[in-house]
Amino acid sequence: MNETNDNDIDQLIYLFSKLPGLGSRSARRIALYLLQDKDVRLKSLINNLVEIDKKIVKCKICGNIDTENICRICSSEYRDKSIIAIVETVAELWAMERSGNFKGLYHVLGHNLSAASRQNPSILRLPELLKRCFAENIKEVIIATNSTLEGQTTAYFITEYLKEHPAKISRLASGIPIGGELDYLDEGTVSAAINLRQPFE
């Protein structure tokens, strides 16, 4: 095997190691698994990634990831359209969906605010949220940001921003440890946090 090929394989391993939850050892295992049967495994993965890249878009209403401009959640007639859960990223949206206990709508912020940084709050898509609250006659807004310092900072900022709207504002409750992120919690814990949510002021 020549030096160029070595570098190419090292680059593949490096790219895998940058994926969440994967270290260098796991990245090497994945690369080896794909390369040992590249005509089937590697090409199949590449073809799927190319197709996904063509089809995946952000929902123009909530910011979810889907294959349609309006995602399946926003377009569903079975969702409770009087409740919106505010999440930091699509990962938290998926965590709440896995719990099977939330039947409302979502608003994906895409970011959070850090008390130590000077981030512009406009990154949170809050004008769009407020517009939705008025246009869709939202009765309750559930702030489902993570229990990290950044998540708490973001939650307080959202509460202040939504003061002009009469919707009830609540926060996910017990079971979410300080510093915890929804995506890493089991479905039962997320369900309990949704059911036991508290008013947030």
From Swiss-Prot:
InterPro entries (UniProt xref): DNA_Rcmb_RecR, Rcmb_RecR, Rcmb_RecR_Znf, TOPRIM_dom, TOPRIM_RecR
Disulfides per UniProt: none
GO terms (BP aspect): DNA recombination; DNA repair
SUPFAM superfamilies tied to this protein: Recombination protein RecR (SSF111304)
Keyword vocabulary terms for this entry: DNA damage, DNA recombination, DNA repair, Metal-binding, Zinc, Zinc-finger
Chain positions of all zinc fingers (C4-type): 59-74
Gene3D superfamilies: 3.40.1360.10, RecR Domain 1
Keyword Zinc-finger carried by entry: yes
A molecular function GO annotation: zinc ion binding
Keyword Zinc appears in the UniProt entry: yes
Record-annotated Toprim domain positions: 82-177
Family the UniProt entry places it in: Belongs to the RecR family.
Function comment: May play a role in DNA repair. It seems to be involved in an RecBC-independent recombinational process of DNA repair. It may act with RecF and RecO.
Protein name: Recombination protein RecR
